[in-house]
Amino acid sequence: MVNDPPVPALLWAQEVGHVLAGRARRLMLQFGVLFCTILLLLWVSVFLYGSFYYSYMPTVSHLSPVHFHYRTDCDSSTASLCSFPVANVSLAKSGRDRVLMYGQPYRVTLELELPESPVNQDLGMFLVTVSCYTRGGRIISTSSRSVMLHYRSQLLQVLDTLLFSSLLLFGFAEQKQLLEVELYSDYRENSYVPTTGAIIEIHSKRIQMYGAYLRIHAHFTGLRYLLYNFPMTCAFVGVASNFTFLSVIVLFSYMQWVWGAVWPRHRFSLQVNIRQRDNSHHGAPRRISRHQPGQESTQQSDVTEDGESPEDPSGTEGQLSEEEKPEKRPLNGEEEQEPEASDGSWEDAALLTEANPPTSASASALAPETLGSLRQRPTCSSS
């Protein structure tokens, strides 16, 4: 029909469509690989930061209940106990992981819940002792602190009871005091003698208590202080640093593997070729010229422009480039043995052997024609 497009235009459109489709697929594949690589690097960065945080940051706070025990084999008619209350607290998580980290200062406190009973108010001051021990039960540290209830007058107690009477009736409040006894203000773990437990003893046989807890709180300084007080900022900086470092490594590896633009290898291969050429010069067999029958063999020596014969022809030829080397043609009936070069880009010329110098009789018998037939090998001066 008249309105139909020409066939070459359709073919051109199909080819352009195939080319564009191929480029689109290639571009999508490249974007997919790039997205997966970035996602993998991000995951590795988060994993590295999490591993560092878990291994570097110790336990911030550890709270362990303290269960006191005492002897009961004495006379029960008295109101006092048979012995001082004693408790043994283990400083290990699940019996394996230690709570304390080497070199980290800790604040160790004992929290006592004491009722405001007349017995406790009449106690006055009493002593609390803690003894830390290591493996085998050996004591490595001991500390003692004195404690007493806070004083409250009779009028203050009556007003407090009237004010919180409704809460006291329904059990939402209690008439008790929570005493916090600081046993260690700066306790540091010894790496050679680790602490495995603590023995707590209250030096009072008439004390009454609801419960007790041993709290260990880490006192951070330096980098640990920043990681604990600014966790989100430190996490962002740490993950970004890891991601940047890994991205640079992957980028340089890709450039070296695909392009080879960072560390080109042609210089190294050039040095290897030069060394192989020098070795071939020293180890190549020398050329032996042979003349036709009826002609006497003569010695061909390299003559420089100054008229001096060089001792090492290979050193002179090594300074010539491929364009400056003269083209050599063999004599009539001459058989040449040219060694193959170690690299195709370098062509080494064979060297002539130095024959023994002729005697005076043979030198005088040489005809002018023979001397004229000798062709000297042109070489460039080393200067």
From Swiss-Prot:
Segments in the Cytoplasmic topological domain: 1-27, 264-383
Residues passing through the membrane, by range: 28-48, 243-263
Domain of life of the organism encoding this protein: Eukaryota
Effect of disrupting the coding gene: Mutant mice display increased early postnatal mortality rate, reduction of total body fat mass, nearly total absence of gonadal fat and great reduction in subcutaneous fat. Mice have enlarged visceral organs, markedly steatotic liver, decreased adipocyte size and number, and display decreased levels of plasma adiponectin and leptin, glucose intolerance and insulin resistance but not hypertriglyceridemia.
Chain positions covered by the region annotation Disordered: 279-383
GO cellular component, as recorded: cytosol; endoplasmic reticulum; endoplasmic reticulum membrane; lipid droplet
Function of the molecule: Plays a crucial role in the formation of lipid droplets (LDs) which are storage organelles at the center of lipid and energy homeostasis. In association with LDAF1, defines the sites of LD formation in the ER. Also required for growth and maturation of small nascent LDs into larger mature LDs. Mediates the formation and/or stabilization of endoplasmic reticulum-lipid droplets (ER-LD) contacts, facilitating protein and lipid delivery from the ER into growing LDs.
Main location: endoplasmic reticulum
Pfam families in the record: Seipin
Residue positions, PTM Phosphoserine: 289, 342, 345
The family this protein is said to belong to: Belongs to the seipin family.
Gene of this entry: Bscl2
PANTHER family named in the record: BERNARDINELLI-SEIP CONGENITAL LIPODYSTROPHY 2 HOMOLOG BSCL2 PROTEIN, SEIPIN
InterPro entries per record: Seipin (IPR009617)
Topological type in the membrane: Multi-pass membrane protein
UniProt name for this protein: Seipin
